[in-house]
Amino acid sequence: MKNVFLDFEKGIEEFEAKIEQLRFAQDNSALDISAEITRLQAKSQGLTKSVYAKLTPWQISQVARHPLRPSTLDYIKHLFTDFEELHGDRNFADDRAIVGGLAHFNGQTVMLIGHQKGHDTKEKIYRNFGMPKPEGYRKALRLMRLAEKFSIPLITFVDTPGAYPGIDAEERGQSEAIGKNLYVMAGLRIPIICIIIGEGGSGGALAIAVGDTSLMLQYSVYSVISPEGCASILWKSADKASDAAEILGITADRLKEMALIDTIIPEPVGGAHRDYPAVMQSVRQALQESLRKLQDIPLETLLQKRLDRLLGYGRFKINKPD
């Protein structure tokens, strides 16, 4: 699929267009213009580094939503072997916005669960734009319990704008399904690694993101509400989304400062969508290290640390004036 450039990448897009024109000309000419192509590539790379070194939270949210950004199934394809997808919640239906199943990671069996948005329009519609309904969360819950039954580590991939807000989802118990997952994940007797790979939208993300360690890609976002949603509530206009993104503290750096995530996984220059092999290697290393650390901790200690971690959220200290 052809690369898609964001609004703040216009200069980069112009360089890339010139490079493509020269490549086409070289293929159809006896002239050697490789030196000029190399020069433009260096300029494009330099500009990309400059732009991405000073991204605003709002711009980072756009990168997190990039249509070519690696999805759960992309990570499964590149990092795991022998993936066997498991379907259905055994109650109502199979929600395609949630994918999950058994796989091998470096020879070890793991359970994988993740949101799946899709890359093009057809797939996005098929996956309901990554917005799960109650049956999706109940499918995830079924797989979590299966992993616990066989003492298999759980790895979840978070990438959703939020849980589906439709009437049918509410009628089938959307809030109950999310709440049940939070409750069960808090006590699952297996190691749990959660990784935010794109958007972490509100309870729809949190329903598969309660674990022992939280990893987050550099240009992902994680928040109780989208910047547009927040702006619509506070200022009655989505035009204030950039201001809302700043206030919400949705970026990996801000969340790490507040101890809401544990590890920031670096992305290639220009974002994960520009270099799949590089980001896959970074995620692989982070998963290997996290899994090794968690499996070295005795189970009862792991569960107590998880409980302490959850109960510690939201605590703050007020310094009284003398």
Curated annotation (Swiss-Prot):
Its EC number is 2.1.3.15. Keywords: ATP-binding, Cytoplasm, Fatty acid biosynthesis, Fatty acid metabolism, Lipid biosynthesis, Lipid metabolism, Nucleotide-binding, Transferase. The keyword Phosphoprotein does not apply. One of its GO terms (cellular component) is acetyl-CoA carboxylase complex. It is an enzyme of class 2 (transferase). Residues 30-293 form the CoA carboxyltransferase C-terminal domain. One of its GO terms (molecular function) is carboxyl- or carbamoyltransferase activity. It is found in: Cytoplasm. Pathway: Lipid metabolism; malonyl-CoA biosynthesis; malonyl-CoA from acetyl-CoA: step 1/1. GO terms for biological process: fatty acid biosynthetic process; malonyl-CoA biosynthetic process. Pfam families: ACCA. SUPFAM superfamilies: ClpP/crotonase. Gene3D superfamilies: 2-enoyl-CoA Hydratase, Chain A, domain 1. It catalyses: N(6)-carboxybiotinyl-L-lysyl-[protein] + acetyl-CoA = N(6)-biotinyl-L-lysyl-[protein] + malonyl-CoA. Component of the acetyl coenzyme A carboxylase (ACC) complex. First, biotin carboxylase catalyzes the carboxylation of biotin on its carrier protein (BCCP) and then the CO(2) group is transferred by the carboxyltransferase to acetyl-CoA to form malonyl-CoA. Belongs to the AccA family. Acetyl-CoA carboxylase is a heterohexamer composed of biotin carboxyl carrier protein (AccB), biotin carboxylase (AccC) and two subunits each of ACCase subunit alpha (AccA) and ACCase subunit beta (AccD). This is Acetyl-coenzyme A carboxylase carboxyl transferase subunit alpha.
